[in-house]
């Protein structure tokens, strides 16, 4: 009886989790129309590109593709506009667009009706990027740069000389094996007057709906970090409703999507303003305005920042900023998901296969829960031995549920049986299941990670639904191994009969890695059940 109810409990918890998850998905922001943006941002509809003190700006100026500056490293394929020095294209050469494609995954781009670029410049009283005068037009030595073999870094300088003779050098520094780019300014004030400038960096993106589903909800939108807010999502609806303006020491601003992130990270010791805006036509902006620098005549000023564009690699993100790794959002069970992710990475480093690593995770979890599982099945066996007495009670008390309940509690107390003893392993397993769900959903390492045979990507559903069907069959076998108690409500019996079918249908669209975890867990549970029952029979408990 307890086994049947435990399976029913799993089902109810599982369905409740899915309903909660779908509610979160339904609450996700929808792409705003141009009309809505115009109405909600009438006072700032010119806030397109250059964030002055009042966050006003000018339209994007992009040269023809042949004039873009190409930079290639072992990780990045970047294109930079000489007008303003904006990064207008970024592809990840080690990550494919599709599992069966040779094309790299593109994060930043501008084509057709979609814009996703990273802008930066100098604003303020003597800034060279302003709404009044436009963007600085830089000169470069060549249109193509590549990280040479044997070299660990590549610096690409952009030079601009203003009318007053002041020279501005905007440098992009790339490092082998990394996705972060140093974006730095060197300003030599050769004029007779002091200069005052302020750096800004922002990410500009056309509002685009996340490719989300009930079984794989994902987030696309902004996020930021500040002294009083370690990590907060700021979605497109938030940007449309209110311009963000948060003064902080350090901080960062980012645009997130499934598995990947782009982020501006100003110096941690500077006072910065994290801002957002929404321009007419549904163009979202999030970024930072840095410290104001006063440069005396004859002086040279260095201004530094970092821009990250790549996968949500927690180790690399943490090295850039101690809170940037929080963009890998494991939900409310993050404290449990983090060690699961670490253990998954640990196993994979030895076996070299993510599917095998998931199997090892399953064995670890089931092994850790074995003492509780043994207590569960022992309690269930004792409950079965009490079935004749429970049946006699049902006949004696009939429909008097109150007296029946009191008599059952007295019997449990006398026989030292805990009717809820079988629930604890289930209650402990569900948080682990949900945490692993988020690990598989959020960890970029599992994107396009193969297992064996037809399972070429553990982060998406089984293309032939073999694993979900096997999982349903394993649930059916577990159910058949437990007799239906005569005291069990007929409605519960019917629900139990349909539970394997319901689970199978749900799991059809779950990531194959998660289904693999549940399938192996069921097989281990069946094996443990046989071993435990064999031991109980030797002790006279059947």
From Swiss-Prot:
Subunit details: Interacts with the Sec translocase complex via SecD. Specifically interacts with transmembrane segments of nascent integral membrane proteins during membrane integration.
Disulfide bond sites: none
PANTHER family per record: CYTOCHROME C OXIDASE ASSEMBLY PROTEIN COX18, MITOCHONDRIAL (PTHR12428:SF65), OXA1 (PTHR12428)
Major place of residence: membrane
The protein's name in its UniProt record: Membrane protein insertase YidC
Originating gene: yidC
Gene Ontology biological-process annotations: protein insertion into membrane; protein transport
A single GO cellular-component term on record: plasma membrane
Organism lineage: Bacteria, Pseudomonadati, Pseudomonadota, Gammaproteobacteria, Alteromonadales
Keyword Cell inner membrane part of the UniProt annotation: yes
Family label: Belongs to the OXA1/ALB3/YidC family. Type 1 subfamily.
Role of this protein: Required for the insertion and/or proper folding and/or complex formation of integral membrane proteins into the membrane. Involved in integration of membrane proteins that insert both dependently and independently of the Sec translocase complex, as well as at least some lipoproteins. Aids folding of multispanning membrane proteins.
